[in-house]
């Protein structure tokens, strides 16, 4: 069989044609054109240069031409922003005259532009693509001359000079630094040239006064820039007639440039504003004299000989030592705080040292007291005083006044008083000692006593209704042995004659009870036989009951029979006694009742 060899799949290859680039990689110019609809619309905007046009430096500052390069945003972008996007015109419109009018109505001083030029990075010089028409240049020249004449006629500079003190007029370095600060731009309003000039100049004065407080914070690099600007102002102020001769392209400022300067100076203005707030708070605390000293003239005629690099660098930016502000700081300083001890042990040692030194430096005033009987005198007294504080004695440690007040204890000044007064004061002090509040204990009643609510209850005593009485039911008496009787007379007669049987007491409650017992057991009469220790004879006591008498007779007969029997058989006699018939006490356990009859021995 033929083996089937599997085919190996071919390796995938990459595409030769690549996909379209994403929107992020497209150039910004193409993206903006698509967004604004320049392809579809009939508006033809001029080409945008890659770099911004640079202003050519003035003739007076040709030496510093390298640092005067300014990059300005192109005009077409702002022109597109000013025109609404929704409106699409069929015919192209010329917008140059509108821009020129705005430029003419918003004059900007030279220092502002110079500062912007220094802050912006240097770019390559590229000539602008658009050229100005001859009619526009003539209009710009006429507007510039009119604005310069308006500034020359205004007396605002004189008012600012009057505010400044004559002492600081000669300080040229500070004036040059003032001119370096930017000027706030006023909003664009379509009004006459004179009204615009009047509105701008007061704002320049206010901003220059606020910038004076920031002068000490400038670095020497800023001072070198101030020298360059001072030289530029020199040429502009000394020869105002020469300014119109300068070509309008160099001196004129467009709306584009103003927008770029506004964007660039926003970051630079935020930091000075914060510093102005701090400095304004510090200057508000000073006296009116200080405010007059800080006020400085805004404008000053500068000649080429007066400007020098040494004058531009401020020598002493710190305030003078003799000024009242520094005097207030010196007076307002609090005294140095004493160092606290590092631990409680160090604090205690320091307190103990102060207590030992206290009686030596501040002796307490001694009152006239009565002479003590057992006191020292002469050299001994002086010796005793020298020992003060060297040997520790009870009560010698002096308390601090705060602790003494809290405890209510007398201080060391009381030691000089007499013995009697000291004793009385000690008793008062003990009474004045604050009583420490005792801990609240649980409320307990009196020890081993019931509370009143329980003790007031009456106790109930139970009385038994049964009465117990003790009665003599019968008695037993012992007599000597009787002689043997020869004749067989009945024992009953002898007993009655000799009164051997004691009669019972008269019938009463006891007899009634005994009768009840006899009735309950008539067959078993109550009978007790007691034997004497000297003889075998026994005396029988019985009651008057006839049943007992019969039993006695029966026992007598038995006794006689025993006597008649021979004495040689005593054992048989004992056996006869053990029987139930011969045992006279066999019935007692059954009939005896402890409740009714109690045995009472006679005396």
Curated annotation (Swiss-Prot):
Segments of skewed composition (Polar residues): 251-264, 305-326, 529-550
Bias (Basic residues) ranges:
438-451
What segments bear the compositional bias annotation Low complexity? 349-358
Subcellular location(s): the record lists:
Cytoplasm, Cytoskeleton, Actin patch
Q: Where is the composition biased (Basic and acidic residues)?
A: 17-42, 180-196, 267-280, 422-433
- Name the major location: cytoplasm
- From the UniProt entry, list the residue stretches annotated as the region Disordered: 1-91, 163-381, 407-457, 478-603
Q: Which UniProt keywords apply?
A: Cytoplasm, Cytoskeleton
Segments of skewed composition (Acidic residues): 169-179, 508-522, 558-581, 591-603
InterPro entries named among the record's database cross-references? Aim21
Its GO CC terms are: actin cortical patch
Cite a single Pfam family from the UniProt record: Aim21
Function of the molecule: Involved in mitochondrial migration along actin filaments.
Family membership noted in the UniProt record: Belongs to the AIM21 family.
**Name of the protein described by the UniProt record:** Altered inheritance of mitochondria protein 21
Q: Which organism is it from?
A: Kluyveromyces lactis (strain ATCC 8585 / CBS 2359 / DSM 70799 / NBRC 1267 / NRRL Y-1140 / WM37) (Yeast)
The upper taxonomy is: Eukaryota, Fungi, Dikarya, Ascomycota, Saccharomycotina
């Amino acid at each position: 069989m033929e083996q089937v060899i599997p085919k190996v799949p071919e390796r995938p290859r990459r595409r030769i044609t690549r996909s379209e680039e994403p929107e992020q990689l497209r150039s910004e110019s193409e993206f903006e054109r698509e967004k604004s609809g320049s392809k579809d619309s009939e508006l033809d905007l001029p080409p945008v240069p890659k770099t911004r046009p640079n202003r050519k430096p003035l003739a007076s500052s040709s030496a510093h031409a390298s640092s005067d390069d300014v990059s300005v945003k192109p005009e077409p972008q702002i022109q597109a922003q000013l025109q609404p996007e929704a409106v699409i015109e069929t015919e192209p419109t010329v917008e140059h005259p509108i821009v020129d009018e705005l430029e003419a109505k918003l004059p900007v001083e030279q220092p502002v532009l110079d500062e912007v030029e220094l802050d912006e990075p240097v770019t390559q010089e590229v000539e602008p693509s658009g050229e100005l028409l001859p009619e526009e240049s003539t209009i710009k020249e006429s507007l510039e001359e009119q604005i310069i004449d308006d500034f020359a006629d205004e007396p605002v500079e004189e008012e600012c000079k009057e505010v400044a003190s004559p002492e600081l007029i000669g300080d040229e370095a500070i004036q040059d630094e003032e001119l370096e600060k930017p000027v706030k731009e006023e909003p664009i309003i379509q009004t006459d040239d004179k009204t615009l000039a009047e509105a701008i100049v007061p704002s320049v004065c206010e901003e220059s006064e606020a910038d004076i407080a920031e002068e000490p914070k400038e670095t020497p690099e800023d001072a070198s820039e101030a020298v360059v600007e001072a030289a530029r102002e020199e040429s502009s102020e000394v020869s105002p007639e020469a300014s119109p001769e300068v070509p309008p392209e160099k001196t004129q400022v467009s709306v584009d440039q103003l927008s770029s300067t506004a964007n660039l100076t926003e970051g630079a203005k935020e930091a000075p504003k914060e510093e102005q707030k701090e400095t304004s708070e510090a200057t508000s605390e000073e006296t009116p004299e200080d405010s007059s000293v800080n006020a400085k003239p805004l404008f000053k005629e500068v000649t080429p000989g007066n400007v020098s690099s040494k004058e531009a660098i401020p020598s002493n930016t710190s305030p003078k030592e003799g000024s009242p502000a520094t005097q207030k700081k010196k007076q307002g300083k609090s005294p140095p705080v004493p160092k606290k001890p590092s631990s409680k042990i160090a604090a205690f040692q320091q307190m103990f040292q102060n207590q030992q030194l206290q009686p030596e430096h501040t002796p307490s005033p001694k009152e006239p007291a009565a002479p003590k009987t057992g006191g020292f005198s002469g050299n001994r007294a002086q010796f005793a005083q020298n020992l003060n504080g060297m040997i520790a004695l009870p009560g010698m440690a002096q308390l601090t006044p705060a602790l003494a007040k809290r405890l209510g204890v007398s201080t060391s000044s009381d030691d000089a008083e007499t013995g009697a007064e000291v004793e009385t004061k000690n008793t008062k002090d003990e009474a004045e000692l604050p009583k420490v509040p005792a801990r609240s204990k649980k409320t307990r009643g009196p020890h081993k006593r019931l509370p009143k609510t329980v003790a007031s209850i009456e106790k109930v005593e139970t009385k038994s209704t049964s009465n117990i009485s003790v009665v003599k039911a019968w008695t037993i008496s012992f007599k000597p042995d009787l002689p043997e009787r020869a004749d067989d007379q009945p024992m009953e007669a002898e007993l009655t004659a000799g009164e051997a049987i004691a009669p019972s007491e008269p019938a009463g409650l006891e007899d009634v009870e005994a009768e009840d017992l006899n009735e309950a057991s008539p067959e078993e009469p109550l009978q007790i036989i007691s034997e004497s220790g000297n003889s075998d004879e026994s005396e029988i006591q019985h009651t008057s009951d006839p049943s007992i008498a019969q039993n006695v007779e029966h026992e007598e007969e038995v006794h006689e029979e025993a006597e008649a029997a021979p004495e040689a058989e005593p054992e048989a006699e004992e056996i006869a006694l053990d029987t139930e018939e011969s045992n006279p006490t066999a019935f007692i356990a059954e009939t005896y009742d402890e409740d009714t009859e109690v045995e009472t021995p006679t005396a």
